[in-house]
Amino acid sequence: MIGRLRGNLLEKQPPELLIEVSGIGYEVQMPMSCFYELPEVGSEAIIYTHYVVREDAQLLYGFNTKNERALFREVIKANGVGPKLGLAILSGMTAAQFVQSVEREDISTLVKLPGVGKKTAERLVVEMKDRLKGWGAGDLFTPATDAAPMDDGSEFITSPQSAVDEAVSALIALGYKPQQASKTVSQVAKPDMTSEVLIRESLKSMI
């Protein structure tokens, strides 16, 4: 079981990163709500991980805190929710927003997430509402999306079009349909936006 990685952040290609620990590079998938908080490429990073073994792959999912990882593990306990959908859920909204939506039984908000239909949203509420009682959203998770610091984008962008393409690819990787991803990014795009900011603004606009 790989539970924690500490090393040099080599690449950031949302929603995936590459971190080098003792000469070994680990590919880690991370919810965008956590990805925004990563340091710049070349810096040291500490990531708490959830390790998944499948017949065809071994996957690592990463988080900035143990509590974010704990929430992810609670999410994937729900019927019909695997790690990929869990990643999309915690990318489409912050951890605090997700907890609030479940507590309020806000099905209409949950179904806006990629891969979450009405039945899945209802299962999330029924199965998780009691388990999430006492989870203080204010001090358990990384800052809400609005408060996330903007990266200078130096490792993300070489031109406006490359930022748009990368943002669209990231949304598709999270489960959004290509047409929806492309349309949403185009609607929020402004000159000189980095791909990270484009992804964040696109996700905000869809919830």
Swiss-Prot record:
| A Pfam family recorded for this sequence | RuvA_N
Coiled-coil regions listed in the entry:
none
Annotated region (Domain III), positions in chain: 159-207
User: What top-level branch of life does the organism fall under?
Assistant: Bacteria
For this UniProt entry, what is the primary localization, expressed as one broad class?
Answer: cytoplasm
- What is one process in the GO biological process aspect for this record? DNA recombination
Q: Name a single GO cellular component.
A: Holliday junction helicase complex
* Chain spans, region Domain II: 65-143
Q: Which CDD domains match?
A: UBA_RuvA_C (cd14332)
Which keywords, in A-to-Z order, does the entry hold?
Cytoplasm, DNA damage, DNA recombination, DNA repair, DNA-binding
Q: Which InterPro entries match?
A: DNA_helicase_Holl-junc_RuvA_I, Hlx-hairpin-Hlx_DNA-bd_motif, NA-bd_OB-fold, RuvA, RuvA_2-like, RuvA_C, RuvA_C_sf
Give the span(s) annotated as Domain I. Answer: 1-64
Q: Output the Gene Ontology terms for molecular function.
A: ATP binding; four-way junction DNA binding; four-way junction helicase activity
Compartments where located: Cytoplasm
Q: Where is this region: Flexible linker?
A: 144-158
User: What does the annotation say about its assembly with partners?
Assistant: Homotetramer. Forms an RuvA(8)-RuvB(12)-Holliday junction (HJ) complex. HJ DNA is sandwiched between 2 RuvA tetramers; dsDNA enters through RuvA and exits via RuvB. An RuvB hexamer assembles on each DNA strand where it exits the tetramer. Each RuvB hexamer is contacted by two RuvA subunits (via domain III) on 2 adjacent RuvB subunits; this complex drives branch migration. In the full resolvosome a probable DNA-RuvA(4)-RuvB(12)-RuvC(2) complex forms which resolves the HJ.
Protein family membership: Belongs to the RuvA family.
Q: Which NCBIfam families match?
A: ruvA
The Swiss-Prot or TrEMBL note on domains reads:
Has three domains with a flexible linker between the domains II and III and assumes an 'L' shape. Domain III is highly mobile and contacts RuvB.
Report the function annotation for this chain. Answer: The RuvA-RuvB-RuvC complex processes Holliday junction (HJ) DNA during genetic recombination and DNA repair, while the RuvA-RuvB complex plays an important role in the rescue of blocked DNA replication forks via replication fork reversal (RFR). RuvA specifically binds to HJ cruciform DNA, conferring on it an open structure. The RuvB hexamer acts as an ATP-dependent pump, pulling dsDNA into and through the RuvAB complex. HJ branch migration allows RuvC to scan DNA until it finds its consensus sequence, where it cleaves and resolves the cruciform DNA.
Protein name stated in the entry: Holliday junction branch migration complex subunit RuvA
